[in-house]
Swiss-Prot record:
GO terms for molecular function: ATP hydrolysis activity; GTP binding; ribosome binding. The gene is der. SMART domains: AAA (SM00382). This is GTPase Der. Keywords: GTP-binding, Nucleotide-binding, Repeat, Ribosome biogenesis.
């Protein structure tokens, strides 16, 4: 599991700048809850070999009781609930503000591990930067510059250390708990995840998940279907931890991200009776970014007329075209229709994700693809694609060697991906293609 770090502070202290710097390795935004323009954002980052999840929040004014600012405060409180460590950011140039005191008072009551970061501290002496903020009672401040990166690595390193002290299991590798294929069922609230879980495991079990505990402790449920073992990773909802925040929503982005990372195959469940939302697309995007095998289930399909079904299929093709590699199934978890085909696709997706691709066959498919359609010239030279081999599994990675490969266009990369998919019948898994210009047996050959 990955430590979760929430960034909290009043408006315009540099939270988003710090968030973008922390998560730059993963393109920053991986999930964005709908609603306000200043809802909380989630991203993944990495310091060395240590991954983490960061949450960016809107400007926090905890004493405001109504309006958009109050809604932003609610989002921030939710982020604090989900976090292992909270980084409280203040502005070193403007000094201590009354809002900072109010935020500090609130954070002290949460029981979370809090780190105080004084941003915009570039060019300032530490003693002068820190002096204003000791009275907040948050310990020694960390002087940073989110814009320039000064002090950020040390800050995040320490945040991860504090998180591991709080929850030692965060230092462990992805869980090997359970038997067979590990499945995560994800989706926004009320799409029928719990009903599908009960249908798969054959008993009213999900209610047992909703017990007091931490917000992110995974629960593994083993079951068999057709004589095959599987392990289901619980994503049934967010549990309350203490009395930090009473009105906790049932959908937890952090819980979803953690379960996707731990799964072999993800079932993305959609609601046929609701339009595809930005939230659906964000969850789907993270699954693809994570490289997880995927099956899409469109639930509540029973009772819909032919015209409605055609419209839904058209919307799926239009809004989720980047999931064309996945199998879509139209099911009813309540009526238990379509579940067998859904699970067969789970097996197929897992097999595709773990496939072994021999180098001679990969190279032959590559050469046939180039012979059929060469990459476009870049300036005076044309990229030369020489040979291919497998660089990893789950998802499959195909490494292509050659010359001048930095000039290969994205459209040509997609063309090659489609050729490899068709040749090896890779359905249900993302496929990564990497281009590598290096010394190889063909490097000095003549065309």
């Amino acid at each position: 599991m990955k430590p979760v770090i929430a960034l909290v502070g009043r408006p315009n202290v540099g939270k988003s700048t710090l968030f973008n710097r922390m998560t730059r390795s993963r393109d920053a935004l991986v999930a964005d809850l709908p609603g306000l323009t200043r809802d909380r954002h989630y991203g993944e980052g990495r310091i060395g070999e240590r991954p983490f999840i960061a949450i960016d929040t809107g400007g926090f004014e905890p004493v405001v009781k109504e309006g958009i600012v109050a809604e932003m405060a609610k989002q921030t409180k939710q982020a604090v609930v989900e976090a292992d460590v909270v980084i409280f950011i203040v502005d070193g140039r403007l000094g201590l503000a009354p809002q900072d005191r109010a935020i500090a008072d609130y954070l002290r009551k949460t029981g979370r591990r809090i780190m105080l970061a004084v941003n915009k501290a570039e060019g300032m002496k530490y003693t002068s930067v820190a002096a204003d903020f000791y009275e907040l009672g948050m310990g020694d401040p960390y002087a940073i510059s989110a814009a320039h990166g000064d002090g950020v690595r040390e800050l995040v390193d320490e945040a991860i250390e504090l998180a591991v002290q709080e929850r030692p299991e965060l230092a462990e590798e992805a869980s090997d708990e359970g038997k067979g294929v590990k499945i995560a069922i994800v989706g926004r609230p009320n799409v029928g995840k719990s009903t599908l879980v009960n249908t798969l495991i054959g008993e009213e079990r999900v209610i047992a998940f909703d017990m007091p505990g931490t917000t992110r402790d995974a629960i593994y449920v083993e079951f068999e279907r057709g004589g095959k073992p599987y392990t289901l990773i619980d994503t049934a909802g967010l549990r309350r931890r203490g009395k930090v925040f009473e009105a906790i929503e049932k959908f937890s982005v952090v819980k979803t991200l953690q379960s996707i990372a731990d799964a072999n195959v993800v079932i993305l469940l959609l609601d046929a009776q609701q339009d595809i939302s930005d939230q659906d697309a964000h969850i789907a995007g993270f699954i693809v970014e994570s490289g997880r095998a995927l099956v899409v289930g469109v639930n509540k399909w029973d009772g819909l007329d032919g015209h409605t079904r055609d419209r839904i299929k058209h919307d799926l093709e239009r809004k989720l075209q980047f999931l064309s590699f996945a199998n879509f199934h139209f099911v009813s978890a309540r009526e238990r229709t379509g579940i067998g085909a859904l699970m067969r696709s789970v097996d197929d997706a897992y097999a595709a994700a773990m496939v072994k691709l021999p180098t001679p066959q990969l190279t032959r498919v590559l050469q046939e693809a180039v012979e059929f359609q060469q990459p476009k010239r870049v300036g005076a030279s044309r990229p030369k694609l020489r040979y291919a081999h497998q660089g990893g599994s789950n998802p499959p990675i195909i490494v292509i060697h050659g010359n001048a490969l930095s000039g290969v266009a994205e459209t040509y990369r997609r063309y090659l991906e489609n050729r490899f998919r068709a040749a090896f019948k890779l359905k249900g898994t993302p496929l990564r293609i990497e281009f590598r210009t290096n010394k190889n047996p063909y490097a000095d050959s003549k065309d």
